[in-house]
């Protein structure tokens, strides 16, 4: 499974030998849709991929985004949409032997009276090698932090779904066209898109799927990319139809000249 790693802090130099390093082997985004008052177990699979023992530390944080700033991890409970205090890990600190694997169970307890459409938090998993590198020679001194996002959707409250097109880049010598969206709603969504290109007679002369589906939390901006077609020069109408993982659809149109 291909993982998208949020590497928050990395310091490294060359080393002739391997050290301990704990990595997250499970997904980095967990979407939960349970009724208020219910519970859910989030399993976090960890593995020490190094040849020496390695410790890890789990820390709770809030999760937010402000368009181009990317993810932010403020202190737990500091944002309005926080569910950090719903989460409890069975352990927060542990040492794994070389190549040892472990599943840490994180319990989510959803309050009975919760009446918002969504909430979110983050588990920051930091790998801390047990032994310091030899100070006399080249060093490998790595501290990796993985951000495991926990995204809750309340099935009892209708969400506000609003994806705003911020920019469309179709010119230049780029091999792809890029459409930038911002999630202006109040719930996370995964979007996939299909682009249709119509000529001046209204005929569809090209259509393609977006290269990758994109997940967006509220206020986050993501770019959807399409392979650029090889078409004759002329006037065209581009129609992009997008769909969320919950089935909502929305579209964008744009006139362009090739």
Predicted feature locations:
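Surface-exposed binding patches on compact interaction domains or structured appendages
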Residues: 22-26, 51-105, 192-195, 199-204
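Short solvent-exposed strand-capping/beta-turn motif centered on an Asx-Ser/Thr pair
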Residues: 47-52, 63, 182-188, 245
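Buried hydrophobic-core signal for structured, non-transmembrane domains
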Residues: 42-48, 99, 106-108, 121-125, ...
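Terminal connector regions
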Residues: 52-66, 109-152, 232-258
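Beta-sheet-dominated interaction scaffolds and their linkers
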Residues: 19-54, 93-94, 161-178
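Short Pro-Gly-centered flexible turn/kink motifs
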Residues: 40-42, 94-107, 217-226
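Beta-strand-rich interaction surfaces with strong enrichment in secreted/lumenal proteins
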Residues: 30-33, 90-96, 210-215, 227-229
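N-terminal signal peptide c-region/cleavage motif recognized by signal peptidases
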Residues: 13-15
């Amino acid at each position: 499974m291909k993982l998208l790693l949020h590497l928050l802090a990395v310091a490294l130099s060359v080393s002739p030998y391997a050290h301990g390093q704990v990595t997250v082997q499970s997904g980095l985004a967990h979407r939960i849709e349970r009724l208020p008052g219910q519970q859910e177990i989030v399993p976090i699979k960890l593995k020490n991929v190094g040849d020496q023992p390695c410790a890890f530390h789990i820390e709770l944080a809030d999760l937010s985004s402000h368009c181009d700033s990317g993810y932010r991890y403020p202190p737990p409970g500091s944002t309005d949409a926080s569910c950090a205090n719903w989460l409890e890990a069975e352990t927060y600190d542990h040492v794994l032997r070389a190549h040892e694997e472990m599943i840490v169970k994180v319990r989510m307890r959803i309050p009975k009276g919760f009446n918002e459409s969504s909430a979110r938090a983050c588990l920051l998993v930091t790998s801390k090698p047990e032994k310091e590198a030899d100070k006399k020679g080249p060093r490998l001194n790595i501290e990796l932090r993985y951000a495991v996002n926990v995204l809750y959707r309340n099935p009892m409250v209708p969400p506000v779904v609003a994806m705003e097109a911020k920019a469309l880049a179709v010119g230049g010598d780029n091999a792809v066209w890029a459409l930038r969206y911002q999630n202006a709603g109040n719930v996370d969504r995964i979007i996939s898109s299909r682009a249709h290109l119509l000529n001046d007679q209204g005929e569809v002369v090209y259509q393609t799927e977006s290269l990758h589906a994109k997940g967006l939390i509220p206020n986050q901006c993501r770019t959807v990319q399409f392979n650029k077609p090889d078409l004759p020069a002329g006037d065209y109408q581009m129609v992009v139809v997008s769909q969320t993982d919950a089935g909502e659809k929305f579209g964008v149109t744009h006139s362009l000249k090739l």
